[in-house]
A protein has these predicted regions:
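A boundary/linker detector
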Residues: 1-13, 37, 131-168
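Short, charged surface segments at domain edges that flank catalytic/cofactor-binding sites
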Residues: 1-29, 50-51, 97-99, 103-108
Length: 168
């Protein structure tokens, strides 16, 4: 799925501007909870219901995050998730300055909202439908290959056991 979603590498100036808006020029931390940042999270999800949402990997859709928050948030709406009782969400972890963090993220989105692209309109319906037909076919081939692999494992295990029994 991610193979069709473009990645736009940010410039140093764009990263600096993003960190400035988020109040992190001196110390980069998780935008959601304040813990040590270990990665960049897509503020708006790239994929939902096994389809691209239209958002891409660009600096305006990325914020510093810790692994706990990134994994817990997944592809949920960031604001709803922050205020939710989902495991490891800022609210469920008792983050004291949650409303300040929300305000900074809202300002970040106001200053440079993530770009949303209608993928099908951009590439045309023929290519789009062809891609998804190939995708469906590939998933079916992977399912069949997995069945074959299971059968191979079973037969090799049986051959192994037969050889061990013959040796005793």
């Amino acid at each position: 799925m991610n193979g069709i979603i473009p990645v736009v590498p940010p410039t140093e100036a764009e990263v600096r501007a993003a960190l400035e808006t988020l109040g992190m020029l001196d110390r980069v931390s998780c935008s959601y909870c304040g813990d040590t940042s270990t990665e960049w999270d897509h503020l708006r999800p790239l994929v939902s219901n096994q389809r691209p949402t239209g958002y891409i990997s660009e600096i305006h859709n990325l914020v510093p995050a810790c692994g706990k928050c990134n994994q817990s948030k997944g592809n949920k709406d960031w604001l709803t998730w922050m205020r939710s009782t989902a495991p490891l969400s800022p609210r469920s972890r008792g983050v004291a300055d949650i409303e300040d963090r929300i305000a900074r993220l809202q300002e970040y989105e106001r200053q440079a909202s993530p770009t949303r692209v209608d993928f099908e309109a951009a590439v045309g319906p023929d290519l789009w439908q062809r891609h998804w037909a190939h995708h469906k076919h590939l998933l079916e081939l992977m399912r069949l290959a997995d069945q074959d692999a299971q059968e191979i494992r079973t037969r090799v295990r049986e051959a192994h056991e037969a050889k061990r029994q013959a040796a005793t």
